[in-house]
Amino acid sequence: MSNFVTLIEPLELTGSRVLRIAVAFAALCGATGLLAFSWWIYKQSSSKPTLPYPVVGDTHAQSLEKNLIKGMQQYRDSPFFLAGSRPPLLILPMSVFHEIHNMPNEYISIIVEHEDKFQGKYTHITTIRPEIPATIRQDLTRNMPNIILELQDELTYASDQWPRTSKWSSVSLYDMMLRTVALLSGRAFVGLPLCRDEGWLQASIGYTVQCVSIRDQLFTWSPVLRPIIGPFLPSVRSVRRHLRFAAEIMAPLISQALQDEKQHRADTLLADQTEGRGTFISWLLRHLPEELRTPEQVGLDQMLVSFAAIHTTTMALTKVVWELVKRPEYIEPLRTEMQDVFGPDAVSPDICINKEALSRLHKLDSFIREVQRWCPSTFVTPSRRVMKSMTLSNGIKLQRGTSIAFPAHAIHMSEETPTFSPDFSSDFENPSPRIFDGFRYLNLRSIKGQGSQHQAATTGPDYLIFNHGKHACPGRFFAISEIKMILIELLAKYDFRLEDGKPGPELMRVGTETRLDTKAGLEMRRR
């Protein structure tokens, strides 16, 4: 009997191994089948569909900039699909811009489109509720004079962390600007002392960085696999951690803000003084229904505002500085303008920056606007999803499920756009849009009746960096003020130059977007 048991034990062990191998093999087959099916779905969705409009350009191009310009030249007044875009992107003529942008979300939705594009399930970027734009438009922008004073104080604190030596030293420009923008934005959104708290800084910056990472990582996978892979990405776990942290931080601040509101509701003067401190939380709560005045909702709103403010503003600011470094002939005219506006205090720690002074820096404003045109973050306006098949007033048919956008960059680079036409004005030579002219918009503003137009924060059908109409970026006035203030500090107190033997980073063009080498360094010294 014992011999029989001795003989059967190896068989049991062998059977166990066989079972494990069989299970592993079945799992492998299942995974392989799922991958094969997902790949088939992906190929079907990314293959060239049968479309009612022409597909323009090289389908294998890394950058779709040339495809867009080519399509605009061939089909300026009719739709075309942008070759190489995923999903296929229908570019519409500007003649239907206002008709499209005035449609309700039930017909044309940016939320549904961005749910896919920005992986809203994991980033929550597409869960922006109406309280955020309402707070920005009605409170933040209206209180800019007071906020600018707060930002200047924060800029003094932030710039103390910049190089202090009068000798040339190499710095990572993007990292330096990222931290500076995060500090200034935090001063407006959460106020002192939280805006300087290292944990809050890392959370607001980290949320921004990880959201971009999630979008880029999941974009490389088939839509079928994204729900399987997404929850396991380290960046997704990081976003959840940042949101939990934000909720914990917001809880006592919400309680304090609600208590202050109740205590001072009848005291208009004190309420106005409280507003002047620039805290975003008390404003935000006024636009939230009572059931959503929770730490989780306010924490999410704060992270969403941080994403919009920190990521885009840092990129825009970094591009402006790089263009100044590459085009040093603009530096002295900008410094001279600063001296004209601020007088001897232009290089003094006691310089007083206010809204009126910022508005008088026409050359700086023009340079910022031209860099935005020359180095856009995207070649098209924010895309939207057609929710119902329809026929537009001029006969253009749109199919349900189609992604649509307008050719912003092609408009900015075309002489057929009136603003960029050589014949736009007889008072000065209007350079081709293919040429960088930092004072282009300074000249345009000199035309009679154009003085209040062509500013860095203004929009129009010929300038779509911030979109246009009711969907124009509500935070653009805050962002441009922030950029100007940081540039004033740089120009007044620092010299900067390219590192020896390095040309400076070139704008990388990928799909419909552009990217910048965030690790590139420049040399700077205290003046």
Swiss-Prot record:
Entry superkingdom: Eukaryota
Pfam family, one: p450
Swiss-Prot/TrEMBL cofactor(s): heme
Keywords, alphabetical: Heme, Iron, Membrane, Metal-binding, Monooxygenase, Oxidoreductase, Transmembrane, Transmembrane helix
Induction details: Expression is induced under gibberellin-producing conditions.
Presence of keyword Transmembrane helix: yes
Alphabetical GO biological process terms: gibberellin biosynthetic process; secondary metabolic process
GO MF term set: heme binding; iron ion binding; monooxygenase activity; oxidoreductase activity, acting on paired donors, with incorporation or reduction of molecular oxygen
EC number: 1.-.-.-
Metabolic or biological pathway: Plant hormone biosynthesis; gibberellin biosynthesis
Gene Ontology CC annotations of this record: membrane
Function of the molecule: Gibberellin 13-hydroxylase; part of the gene cluster that mediates the biosynthesis of gibberellins (GAs), diterpenoids that may provide a selective advantage during infection of the preferred host plant, rice. Gibberellins (GAs) are diterpenoids and are synthesized via the mevalonate pathway. Biosynthesis of the major metabolite GA3 (gibberellic acid) from geranylgeranyl diphosphate (GGPP) requires 13 steps.
Protein family (similarity comment): Belongs to the cytochrome P450 family.
Name under which the protein is recorded: Cytochrome P450 monooygenase 3
Organism whose genome encodes this protein: Gibberella fujikuroi (strain CBS 195.34 / IMI 58289 / NRRL A-6831) (Bakanae and foot rot disease fungus)
